[in-house]
């Protein structure tokens, strides 16, 4: 019954124009096909609309809180107060950081320059390493051995004279200041060496001899003929010359003896020479000569060298009036005075104006020191000067001169004892101007080697002294292995035999010619002990001089006590020297005990330092077997030439104690903060 009714309704809807969507036609199309409603008779049929598609809403980015709402909330106390607190905390923090930075800069001591921070290594280039098999050391040979030098913890290489020279006075008679002597290589070799040295993080300084030139120098040859500006480049004076005999203008003597005046046949005058007659002195009262020397300084600095050792600077000026110098022995017949030591050299050395020249050289070097990390070092050689005169080379607080004059007091000691070492140390430290930096040498090319001068037993103790004294340690090549002088009696070289003894070839190994060269000959003979005293052998020996040297240089590099600390010289006797190294803020002290006597000795350190502990640990010893063990401070036993570095802690450092205050020295006062891990000077 119901089914019949549904069928009738469906038919009725169809008959009255109801349209259905079959799923393939859009509703809009169906509506367009609908008959006009006016033509369609009204009916009560129900029309079922199709479902509409949902419309998507466009989502816009969040534009933030409206300004009016923002102001409404921002003014509330719960937001305003935290905001203001954070703002002022930020401001205060910024000012605190700025203030702390400024304070650290103000209170921190000046950082050590490169020439202060580590040891220097002096090389006589003809004797270090031969690279081209001609029996002579050269620049390439030095470059080949840079790894060895680096392994010694060296920071600066110092090369002695390598300028073009006719071989007089070990190349200190320079024929051309801007050329490399061919025996050492070429300018390109030098440039390569400079680059290699800097690549290793090292610095390079070279010798410079401004006082004189070779008589082969073009300047002198032109001066002999009175050619233009060169006429007065040297010191000329009228003199009498007859029958091969010269009567000089005065009694001035050469360092090597006899008159310092030499007659020249070309110019018919005498020229002045403080050294050999082949080394005429330049006339530094001529401004043109001063400018020439400055140009030479600039030339080598532009090549990349990091500094100079200025040689023989006390001879730069002489008195104008040529007065005779006073005899040491006034009763001696004047004609018999021929030795340099027989006169007081008041008119030929350290004249007024000489230091002005040195300061002028310093200012020229400063033109190349303006770049960060490129400070140019200046050292001066001042042999045989009094301590007071030597210290003048440091300059003044407001006038810069040398960074330091080279200290050869230890290098010239012929007799070792506790007293002589103590006097050599105190004579420098007590006279050095405040704030200046000391340096120490135990050998050099102009002195006999340490082993031959005082004995091989003291090599280790002297190296320990070198690295534990305040200041810059300077090592002459071969001293790290205990090389000695050679024994020679007859040489073809045109030199004083005694001056050659400390210049023998470096002893690298026990092969032919000590590994110095592959040639069949060497310019000087090697030392006969090279089979046992050489680098290769000592590398493998725990008790060797080389191994101790490396340990000492490493300790010096790592310990602020040794580079920045106080030095307190406590006692000396005929055998020993005792001193401490200490620094405020570091809870340890190094107590150094060295025996320079001719026999063993026993020290009671309790008598010297009342509050020293009964037992002290050995940090480093010349006898490696005792390293790390303890010693009884009531009776410290030292063999001949033995040295100990003892480590302990002390509540009140010695430089604060009245009893020792006058015996303590420091160049730049500093204290250490372990909390901040920094040094500061306001202490």
Curated annotation (Swiss-Prot):
GO terms for cellular component: apical plasma membrane; brush border membrane; vacuolar membrane. It comes from the Eukaryota. Disulfide bonds join 239-270, 568-664, 671-683. SUPFAM superfamilies: (Trans)glycosidases. Residues 1-50 are annotated as: Disordered. Predominantly expressed in kidney and intestine. In kidney localized to the apical membrane of the proximal tubules. Residues 1-86 are cytoplasmic. The keyword Transferase does not apply. GO terms for biological process: amino acid transport; aspartate transmembrane transport; carbohydrate metabolic process; gene expression; L-cystine transport; L-glutamate transmembrane transport. The chain crosses the membrane at residues 87-107. It holds the Pfam family Alpha-amylase. One of its GO terms (molecular function) is protein heterodimerization activity. The modification Phosphoserine is found at residues 10, 383. Residues 1-10 have a biased composition (Basic and acidic residues). Residues 108-683 are extracellular. It is a single-pass type II membrane protein. Ca(2+) binds at residues 211, 281, 315-316, 318. Keywords: Amino-acid transport, Calcium, Cell membrane, Disulfide bond, Glycoprotein, Membrane, Metal-binding, Phosphoprotein, Signal-anchor, Transmembrane, Transmembrane helix, Transport. Glycans are attached at residues 211, 238, 258, 329, 510, 520, 574. Acts as a chaperone that facilitates biogenesis and trafficking of functional transporter heteromers to the plasma membrane. Associates with SLC7A9 to form a functional transporter complex that mediates the electrogenic exchange between cationic amino acids and neutral amino acids, with a stoichiometry of 1:1. SLC7A9-SLC3A1 transporter has system b(0,+)-like activity with high affinity for extracellular cationic amino acids and L-cystine and lower affinity for intracellular neutral amino acids. Disulfide-linked heterodimer composed of the catalytic light subunit SLC7A9 and the heavy subunit SLC3A1. The heterodimer is the minimal functional unit. Assembles in non-covalently linked heterotetramers (dimers of heterodimers) and higher order oligomers; the oligomerization is mediated by SLC3A1 likely to prevent degradation in the endoplasmic reticulum and facilitate heteromer trafficking to the plasma membrane. Disulfide-linked heterodimer composed of the catalytic light subunit SLC7A13 and the heavy subunit SLC3A1. This is Amino acid transporter heavy chain SLC3A1. It comes from Rattus norvegicus.
């Amino acid at each position: 019954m119901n089914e019949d009714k549904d069928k009738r309704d469906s038919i009725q809807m169809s008959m009255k124009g109801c349209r259905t969507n079959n799923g393939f036609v859009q509703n809009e199309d169906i509506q367009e096909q609908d008959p006009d409603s006016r033509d369609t008779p009204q009916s009560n049929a129900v029309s079922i609309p199709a479902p509409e598609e949902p419309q998507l809403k466009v989502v816009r980015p969040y534009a933030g809180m409206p300004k009016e709402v923002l102001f409404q909330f921002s003014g509330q106390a719960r937001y305003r107060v935290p905001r203001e607190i954070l703002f002022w905390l930020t401001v205060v923090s910024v000012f605190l950081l700025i203030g702390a930075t400024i304070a650290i800069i103000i209170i921190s001591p000046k950082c050590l320059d490169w020439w202060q921070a580590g040891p220097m290594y002096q090389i006589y280039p003809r004797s270090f390493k031969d690279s081209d098999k001609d029996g002579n050391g050269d620049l390439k040979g030095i470059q080949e051995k840079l790894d060895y030098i680096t392994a010694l913890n060296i920071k600066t290489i110092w090369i002695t004279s390598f300028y073009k020279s006719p071989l007089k006075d070990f190349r200190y008679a320079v024929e051309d200041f801007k050329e490399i002597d061919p025996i050492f290589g070429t300018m390109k070799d030098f440039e390569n060496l400079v680059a290699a040295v800097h690549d290793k993080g090292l610095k390079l300084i070279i010798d410079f001899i401004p006082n004189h030139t070779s008589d082969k120098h073009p300047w002198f040859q032109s001066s002999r003929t009175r050619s233009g500006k060169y006429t007065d480049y040297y010191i000329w004076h009228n003199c009498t010359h007859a029958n091969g005999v010269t009567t000089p203008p005065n009694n001035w003597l050469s360092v090597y003896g006899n008159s310092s005046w030499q007659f020249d046949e070309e110019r018919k005058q005498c020229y002045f020479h403080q050294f050999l007659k082949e080394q005429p002195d330049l006339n530094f009262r001529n401004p043109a000569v001063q400018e020439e020397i400055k140009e030479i300084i600039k030339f080598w600095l532009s090549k990349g060298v990091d500094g100079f050792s200025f040689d023989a600077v006390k001879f730069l000026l002489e008195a104008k009036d040529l007065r005779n110098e006073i005899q040491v022995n006034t009763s001696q017949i004047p004609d018999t005075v021929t030795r340099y030591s027989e006169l007081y050299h008041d008119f030929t050395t350290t004249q007024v104006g000489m230091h002005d020249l040195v300061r002028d050289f310093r200012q020229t070097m400063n033109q190349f020191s303006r770049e960060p990390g490129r400070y140019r070092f200046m050292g001066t050689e001042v042999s045989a000067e009094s301590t007071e005169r030597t210290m003048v080379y440091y300059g003044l607080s407001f006038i810069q001169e040398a960074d330091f004059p080279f200290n050869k007091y230890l290098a010239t000691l012929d007799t070792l004892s506790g007293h002589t070492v103590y006097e050599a140390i105190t004579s420098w430290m007590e006279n050095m101007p405040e704030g200046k930096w000391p340096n120490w040498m135990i050998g050099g090319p102009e002195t006999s080697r340490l082993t031959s001068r005082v004995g091989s037993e003291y090599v280790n103790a002297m190296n320990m002294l070198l690295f534990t004294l305040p200041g810059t340690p300077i090592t002459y090549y071969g001293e790290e292995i205990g090389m000695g002088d050679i024994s020679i009696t007859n040489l073809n070289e045109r030199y004083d035999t005694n001056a050659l003894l400390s210049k023998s070839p470096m002893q690298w190994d026990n092969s032919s010619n000590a590994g110095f060269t592959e040639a069949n000959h060497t310019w000087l003979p090697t030392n006969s002990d090279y089979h046992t005293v050489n680098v290769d052998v000592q590398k493998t020996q725990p008790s060797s001089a080389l191994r101790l040297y490396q340990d000492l240089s490493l300790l010096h590099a790592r310990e602020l006590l040794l580079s920045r600390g106080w030095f307190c010289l406590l006692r000396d006797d005929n055998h020993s020297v005792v001193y401490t190294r200490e620094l405020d803020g570091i809870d340890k002290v190094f107590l150094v005990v060295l025996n320079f006597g001719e026999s063993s000795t026993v020290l009671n350190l309790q008598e010297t330092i009342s509050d020293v502990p009964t037992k002290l640990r050995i940090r480093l010893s010349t006898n490696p077997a005792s390293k790390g063990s303890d010693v009884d401070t009531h009776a410290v036993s030292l063999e001949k030439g033995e040295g100990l570095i003892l480590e302990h802690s002390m509540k009140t450092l010695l430089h604060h104690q009245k009893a020792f205050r006058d015996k303590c020295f420091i160049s730049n006062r500093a204290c250490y903060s372990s909390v901040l891990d920094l040094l500061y000077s306001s202490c």
